[in-house]
From Swiss-Prot:
<comment type="function">
    <text>Specifically methylates the N4 position of cytidine in position 1402 (C1402) of 16S rRNA.</text>
</comment>
<dbReference type="InterPro" id="IPR023397">
    <property type="entry name" value="SAM-dep_MeTrfase_MraW_recog"/>
</dbReference>
<feature type="binding site">
    <location>
        <position position="52"/>
    </location>
    <ligand>
        <name>S-adenosyl-L-methionine</name>
    </ligand>
</feature>
<keyword id="KW-0698">rRNA processing</keyword>
<feature type="binding site">
    <location>
        <position position="79"/>
    </location>
    <ligand>
        <name>S-adenosyl-L-methionine</name>
    </ligand>
</feature>
<dbReference type="GO" id="GO:0005737">
    <property type="term" value="C:cytoplasm"/>
</dbReference>
<protein>
    <recommendedName>
        <fullName>Ribosomal RNA small subunit methyltransferase H</fullName>
        <ecNumber>2.1.1.199</ecNumber>
    </recommendedName>
</protein>
<feature type="binding site">
    <location>
        <position position="100"/>
    </location>
    <ligand>
        <name>S-adenosyl-L-methionine</name>
    </ligand>
</feature>
<keyword id="KW-0949">S-adenosyl-L-methionine</keyword>
<keyword id="KW-0808">Transferase</keyword>
<dbReference type="GO" id="GO:0071424">
    <property type="term" value="F:rRNA (cytosine-N4-)-methyltransferase activity"/>
</dbReference>
<keyword id="KW-0963">Cytoplasm</keyword>
<dbReference type="InterPro" id="IPR029063">
    <property type="entry name" value="SAM-dependent_MTases_sf"/>
</dbReference>
<dbReference type="InterPro" id="IPR002903">
    <property type="entry name" value="RsmH"/>
</dbReference>
<dbReference type="GO" id="GO:0070475">
    <property type="term" value="P:rRNA base methylation"/>
</dbReference>
<keyword id="KW-0489">Methyltransferase</keyword>
<comment type="similarity">
    <text>Belongs to the methyltransferase superfamily. RsmH family.</text>
</comment>
Length: 301
């Protein structure tokens, strides 16, 4: 398969990782290998450890990276477990960590994966094809209260109670377009002009299937001790739920830990403001539109 994937905010990632040729770097979301490939080119004496739980992504990215160098290792794992996986390799400190959150373009574009509300497929949405829970299970087996919670919390769907009740009434729902068309049919005409109403519903179901937000929380809890001094954590997010988790974590690590009257202590971490794609990148890659990059740098042990 030809890899036409365009990595988001690539130059900004490479600049802010401050790559050292002998450094150890972690890509928590390998995907099609776009970021990892460029990192590898710049660390000839270093090591790249990349994580993904999607077999399709791992297979294709492995070929991409092998064309550049062999000083990398790919681990099939949810990034929430990355600290344990690194420990198994004897790695306890790293020079930089990157996470490009959410769904990848190939996952959307491959209709058979069931992520797209524009292409017909079985309801799937599993990033890890070996796991049992799928979108079909969420749509057809969850009780109405749990559906309501998912739609409200993970999709920020305004009419979440109504949508959940209509999903229950229409069961069984077998395909992505069945679900998308159902949502469209029960959405007021004036709202249809704003955006496809299935977008947020599909987002909510996908997040539930892949346990995405809990994984982000668990991943972040492992970062603090792994970063060397002057090493950075870079996180690209694409929607407000992800970004809020990252923002709150960064604020927690950078805010003063002592009462104001206590002796001043130097901060251990420094966080930058969000970085957005340039106009040039937006013109080349429209899917980068909602991307935001946050950077946390460790400045003291």
């Amino acid at each position: 398969m030809k890899n036409n994937h365009i990595p988001v905010l690539l130059n900004e990632v490479l600049d802010n990782l401050a790559l050292k040729e002998n450094g150890i770097y972690i890509d928590l979301t390998l995907g099609m290998g776009g970021h990892s490939k460029e990192i590898l080119k710049r660390i000839p004496k270093g090591k790249l450890i990349a994580f993904d739980k999607d077999d399709f992504a791992i297979k294709n990215a492995s070929k991409t990276l092998s064309e550049v160098a062999n000083n990398f290792e790919i681990i099939k794992s949810d990034f929430k477990d990355f600290k344990e996986e690194l420990s198994n390799l004897g790695i306890y400190k790293v020079d930089g960590i990157l996470a490009d959150l959410g769904i990848s373009s190939p996952q959307i574009d491959n209709a058979e994966r069931g992520f797209s509300y524009l292409k017909n497929s079985a309801l799937d949405m599993r990033m890890d094809q070996s796991q049992k829970l799928s979108a079909y299970d969420v749509v057809n087996l969850y009780p109405v209260e749990k559906l309501e919670y998912i739609l409200k919390t993970y999709g920020e769907v305004k009419n979440y109670k109504y949508i959940a009740s209509k999903i229950i009434e229409a069961r069984p729902i077998n395909t992505t377009l069945e679900l998308a068309n159902l949502i469209k049919s029960v959405t007021p005409q004036k709202l249809l002009k704003l955006k496809n109403p299935a977008k947020n519903v599909f987002q909510a179901i996908r997040i539930e299937v892949n346990n995405e937000l809990d994984s982000i929380h668990q991943m972040l809890s492992s970062v603090e001790d792994l970063l060397k001094v002057n090493a950075s954590l870079l996180i690209i997010s694409f929607h407000s739920l992800e970004d809020k988790i990252v923002k709150n974590y960064f604020q927690e690590l950078t805010k003063p830990k002592l009462p104001s009257k206590m002796p001043i202590q130097e901060d251990k971490f420094f966080a930058t403001r969000r970085i957005y794609p340039s106009k040039q990148e937006l013109n080349l890659n429209s899917r980068s539109k909602s991307a935001k990059l946050r950077i946390l740098t460790k400045i003291k042990d």
